[in-house]
């Protein structure tokens, strides 16, 4: 996922973990 820039990207960032 992308960096946390928006609320929509928050879940994508968790997947990057």
UniProtKB/Swiss-Prot annotation:
Flagellin is the subunit protein which polymerizes to form the filaments of bacterial flagella. Flagella are an important component in the invasiveness of B.bacilliformis. The keyword Isomerase does not apply. The keyword Secreted applies. This is Flagellin. Keywords: Bacterial flagellum, Secreted. One of its GO terms (cellular component) is bacterial-type flagellum. It is found in: Secreted; Bacterial flagellum. Belongs to the bacterial flagellin family. It comes from Bartonella bacilliformis.
